[in-house]
């Protein structure tokens, strides 16, 4: 049980780092347009100050509160950590990543960022330690409606896209691609991550059982 928990937390933190790095890459490739949620956070940053990461935390806290009220359950510790750490990691990567000077570089970096976002979400959600604010809402809607997770994700992304556009956020062709492709990638990354985690847990459990007892 202890070994399984360690593996789950490893997947969780690895997923958060992958996700945050992907977000920062899409921001660096903003010549194409920023991903919907980050365009929304970026527009808030433009209007009211603070940082993109700080607005990610604030909006996440509001969503966690709404989801908790709807389900009448306290959020998992993983959801709370996600709410804070994603914002911190985004600001960290935004600080250390060099600015791009070419359009070709923006395309490459943005494309890689979209893939990492989709897989980052799949990896940390597979740990079962509490999805982040936005993904908790996604899973709640999926559970209550029975709709495909890809379409739920796309619907949320498109809704936020229009909100960001209305606030003058950096919307472009890349924003539309992110809204569509993230849900598609998640459809594959989530079951793949669950399968990989279960395999790692089974291997670790078998290794522990096979090891000689300590006297």
Curated annotation (Swiss-Prot):
It is found in: Cell membrane. GO terms for cellular component: plasma membrane. InterPro entries: YczE/YyaS-like. The keyword Transmembrane helix applies. The chain crosses the membrane at residues 9-29, 50-70, 77-97, 107-127, 160-180. It comes from the Bacteria. Keywords: Cell membrane, Membrane, Transmembrane, Transmembrane helix. It is a multi-pass membrane protein. This is Uncharacterized membrane protein YczE. It comes from Bacillus subtilis (strain 168). The lineage of its organism: Bacteria, Bacillati, Bacillota, Bacilli, Bacillales.
